[in-house]
Amino acid sequence: MQYVIISRFDPDKTATLQQDLPAETFAAIDQATQDGKVLDLAELTGMGVSSELAQVLVDHLSHLTRLRDSGGLVSGGPCEGFKHAINVFEADSEQQARDLHDADPLAKYGFFEIDQVYGWKQVF
């Protein structure tokens, strides 16, 4: 079954993240991700990202890539304005979907938490 999880970003951590990631850096990371490439630590620090934040981002993007490649993550990403994110998980139960979400390093570091969960049937 598929589950839609709507996550709520922590506004203070998001503000810090946006300060540490200029728009052009975020755009480059986003584009690489859309192209199927996970940037490594050297590439991120080369863009001026602190080594601590770069490691969290590498772990986050690697986690999502592994989930996607294994079929556990159907789709996902932040909503405009970084107040929420929407992820669609393939899971045997709601709890398993929650566990997949909470295993994300950004969730572990408190950048976001689950706001709502819905069982979902994909029709189109």
Predicted regions located by residue number:
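Conserved, structured core segments of small domains
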Residues: M1-F124
